[in-house]
């Protein structure tokens, strides 16, 4: 009887030792596998980061995520550039392959084929209403035309800054501007804006609220007018509503991914003197007028210097939305 008990105890003891040995062996094997896999992953990760040139990334528009390039200093490999030009340029060049030619020339300056977009507009009015500034960098070419200096200057103020606007019902309400950043922006084929300042009794100051002929004219037959009046004073407005709209807008700050190149003209239009323009950084420049080919060649030559005074936006931005936001 005692022999059987000793045999049973010995059997369990040997089994325990054997199982312990198996578990230790399995643990060593698993540790070896885990360490080896971890080492391989670290080595492969290091090698893959060193080879991440980013050249094969598809560039189809502004990207929400900025793709960092650890081995390439050229910032334009992951950027998009939009070039806006008047219809006159395409008509004068009269070459079906002119955009391809310019794309190849931009390539010599570090802008890959497919990263530069050419956008045509017919006139200042059309462009101011719906500019569609979608790219990381947006360069607008504006041909200087005598008699349109004011429209061009106000277009520059419009697209070089971000605005938050609300509709105005001038038939029911009086309006006042609350500060230097608060303007009334009027757009249309022909905008004439008249105002009548009011005192605390809502009586006209130097004008009669019931007689539009006595109102003060602040914009006359303009396509685009940014109206500035005395702050904190109520005004009754009269606008050519059949050909024009007007909105109450606040300037939020500079739109730093936009630059304007004035083509021709004796002097460059300067909007930096406006106290609401902050910071006072010039993003308007002028090139001499010769032929449109010469203008585009100049832009290609200096494009990298131009974007140095701009700030890249990593997301698409429809500039026209500023005018219709409520």
Curated annotation (Swiss-Prot):
Binding, Ca(2+) 2: 177, 228-229, 231, 301
Signal peptide limits: 1-50
Keyword Kinase: no
Record note on modification: N-glycosylated. The N-terminus is blocked possibly by pyroglutamic acid.
Highest rank taxon of the organism: Viruses
Its job: Calcium-binding protein that interacts with rotavirus cell receptors once the initial attachment by VP4 has been achieved. Rotavirus attachment and entry into the host cell probably involves multiple sequential contacts between the outer capsid proteins VP4 and VP7, and the cell receptors. Following entry into the host cell, low intracellular or intravesicular Ca(2+) concentration probably causes the calcium-stabilized VP7 trimers to dissociate from the virion. This step is probably necessary for the membrane-disrupting entry step and the release of VP4, which is locked onto the virion by VP7.
Disulphide bonds in the chain: 82-135, 165-249, 191-244, 196-207
Region GPR motif, residue ranges: 253-255
Residues that bind Ca(2+) 1: 95, 206, 214, 216
Quaternary structure, from the entry: Homotrimer; disulfide-linked. 2 Ca(2+) ions bound at each subunit interface in the trimer hold the trimer together. Interacts with the intermediate capsid protein VP6. Interacts with the outer capsid protein VP5*.
Region (CNP motif): 165-167
Additional detail: Some rotavirus strains are neuraminidase-sensitive and require sialic acid to attach to the cell surface. Some rotavirus strains are integrin-dependent. Some rotavirus strains depend on ganglioside for their entry into the host cell. Hsp70 also seems to be involved in the entry of some strains. In group A rotaviruses, VP7 defines the G serotype.
The name this protein goes by in its record: Outer capsid glycoprotein VP7
Pfam hit, one: VP7
Keyword annotations of the record: Calcium, Capsid protein, Disulfide bond, Glycoprotein, Host endoplasmic reticulum, Host-virus interaction, Metal-binding, Outer capsid protein, Signal, T=13 icosahedral capsid protein, Virion
GO molecular function: metal ion binding
Lineage: Viruses, Riboviria, Orthornavirae, Duplornaviricota, Resentoviricetes
Family classification: Belongs to the rotavirus VP7 family.
Sites where a glycan is attached: 69
Annotated spans, LVD motif: 237-239
Main localization category: virion
Locations listed in the record: Virion; Host endoplasmic reticulum lumen
GO cellular component: host cell endoplasmic reticulum lumen; T=13 icosahedral viral capsid; viral outer capsid
């Amino acid at each position: 009887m005692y022999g059987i008990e000793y045999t049973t105890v010995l059997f369990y003891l040997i089994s325990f030792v054997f199982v312990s040995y198996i578990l230790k062996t399995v643990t060593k094997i698993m540790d070896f596998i885990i360490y080896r896999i971890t080492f391989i992953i670290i080595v492969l990760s290091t090698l893959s980061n060193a080879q991440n040139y980013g050249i094969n990334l598809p560039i189809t528009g502004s990207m929400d995520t900025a793709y960092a390039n650890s081995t390439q200093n050229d910032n334009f490999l992951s950027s998009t550039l939009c070039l806006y030009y008047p219809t006159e340029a395409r008509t004068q060049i009269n070459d079906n392959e002119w955009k391809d030619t310019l794309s190849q020339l931009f390539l010599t300056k570090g802008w890959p084929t497919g990263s530069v977009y050419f956008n045509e507009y017919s006139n200042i009015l059309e462009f101011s209403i719906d500019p569609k500034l979608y790219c990381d960098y947006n360069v607008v070419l504006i041909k200087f035309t005598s008699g349109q200096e004011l429209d061009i200057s106000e277009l520059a103020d419009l697209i070089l800054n971000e605005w938050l606007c609300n509709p105005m019902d001038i038939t029911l309400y009086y309006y006042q501007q609350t500060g230097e950043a608060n303007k009334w922006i009027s757009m249309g084929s022909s905008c004439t804006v008249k105002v009548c300042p009011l005192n605390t009794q809502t009586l006209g100051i130097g004008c009669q609220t019931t007689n539009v002929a006595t109102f003060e004219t602040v914009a006359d037959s303009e396509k685009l007018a940014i109206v500035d009046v005395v702050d904190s004073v109520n005004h009754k407005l009269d606008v050519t509503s059949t050909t024009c709209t007007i909105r109450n807008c606040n300037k939020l700050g500079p739109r730093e991914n936009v630059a304007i190149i004035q083509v021709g003209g004796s002097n460059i239009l300067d909007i930096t003197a406006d106290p609401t323009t902050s910071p006072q950084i010039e993003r308007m420049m002028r090139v001499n007028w010769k032929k449109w080919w010469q203008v585009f060649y100049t832009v290609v030559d200096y494009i990298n210097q131009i974007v140095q005074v701009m700030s890249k936006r990593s997301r698409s931005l429809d500039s026209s939305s500023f005018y219709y936001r409520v």
